[in-house]
Amino acid sequence: MLPTLNERVVELAVRTGMALNCEVHQESKFDRKQYFYGDLPKGYQISQYDLPLCFDGAVDIPSDDPDIGGGGTKRIGIIRAHLEEDTGKLGHELPGGGSYAGSLVDLNRAGTPLLEIVTEPDFDRVEDVLVFARELRSICRFLGVTQGVMQKGHMRFEPNINLVIDTTDGREFRTPVVEIKNLNSFRAVEGAIRYEQSRQLEEFLETGRTMGLGMKRTRGWDDQKLVTVLQREKEDAHDYRYFPEPDLPPVEMDVEWRE
């Protein structure tokens, strides 16, 4: 069965992008993002690479960050908002809460439309991350894009975290970036970020590892143990071997429809 795109999905994505003060590409397209993982049995994901629907936006959030004087606003840049298909879900628990040594694959949500919003790295406080996350959920709820029930997976957050460490001799080091996948509660977002701050500092002091090509990792959040756990090494974008999706035509929007 070939993939199809419905107009309603594009409408909701563009509506969200405009609410985030994004520019909207008049012509957009889809691409195949190729990688191997248990939740993606076909070996590629339909996504958008170089021509996302929406790009270059910003959201102002209230912030008590002392670096901006406290009690002001902080601008969070939006790099892009693009459509892609959702993947499956890997589980490691049995009904009733028992643990399972392997992985249970749930493909019920695979192929459903997903809007991914990517921010600039404008956060340096976990408090601002939480304010932004709640603001984003409020915007999407108001627009009717989602019910925003976190426990049902309506919204998931995937923070990318690393530290900038200044040493006493005046040098600056940046730890490798870690992406925490599929956080479905604000408590999990806060817990994962705070844990990673401590873990990455400890790792740097032990190993001296710093940011570099191919050093990015993907970790998950264990809600029971309150720790992050390694899931896989994260490939760089060029390793995904993006190429235009042959089974979906480009998306062209005229000005009247957009307005």
What are these regions (language model features)?
Residues 1-259:
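Basic, nucleic-acid-interacting segments
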